[in-house]
């Protein structure tokens, strides 16, 4: 298999991602770069990657760095993978999520992001969609490229599944 990494316009990327994944591709303030990964022999899209400005506060990251970083400096040198999504069945059959994560850590992507933002990125971070509730993550086994530094914490409620939503809506 051969792959190409193509930077996409927001609207096209968002439409394709929304048809593939179970969430809406909402925008965050700050930097954003959107890529699709295609298998070149079949011209099939096998994954989506969206980079953006890192989260302002992340306890595992702050613990790893020893303190809350100076955000002006940190935001110039760090980038976050917000959506790292393989299409199916490529994701399951060929460990597509690991390929997408490895692409995020590649020198080619780093060069493109450095050029786009006129900086030198030295940290890539991401969070796992399901945390540890499934007993594993697609990022497991990615060392030395990605290292687990702890679970993030949130006070947001999980999104309700499609099955229970109508029942709860009627109840309320």
For each predicted feature, which ranges?
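Acyl-donor binding region in acyl/amide transferases
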Residues: 33, 42-172
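Low-complexity, highly charged intrinsically disordered N-terminal segments
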Residues: 1-44
């Amino acid at each position: 298999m051969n792959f190409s990494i193509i930077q996409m316009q927001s609207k096209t990327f968002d439409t394709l991602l929304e048809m593939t994944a179970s969430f809406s591709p909402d925008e965050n303030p700050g930097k954003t770069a959107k890529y699709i990964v295609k298998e070149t022999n079949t011209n099939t899209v096998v994954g989506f990657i969206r980079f953006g400005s890192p989260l302002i506060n992340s306890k595992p990251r702050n613990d790893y760095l020893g303190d809350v970083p100076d955000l002006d400096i940190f935001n110039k040198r760090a980038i976050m993978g917000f959506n790292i999504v393989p299409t199916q069945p490529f994701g399951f059959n060929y460990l597509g999520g690991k390929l997408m994560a490895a692409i995020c850590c590649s020198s080619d992507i780093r060069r493109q992001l450095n050029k786009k933002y006129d900086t030198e990125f030295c940290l890539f971070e991401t969070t796992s969609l399901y945390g540890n509730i499934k007993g594993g993550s697609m990022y497991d086994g990615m060392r030395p490229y990605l290292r687990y530094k702890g679970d993030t914490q949130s006070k947001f409620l999980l999104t309700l599944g499609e099955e229970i939503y109508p029942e709860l809506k009627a109840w309320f």
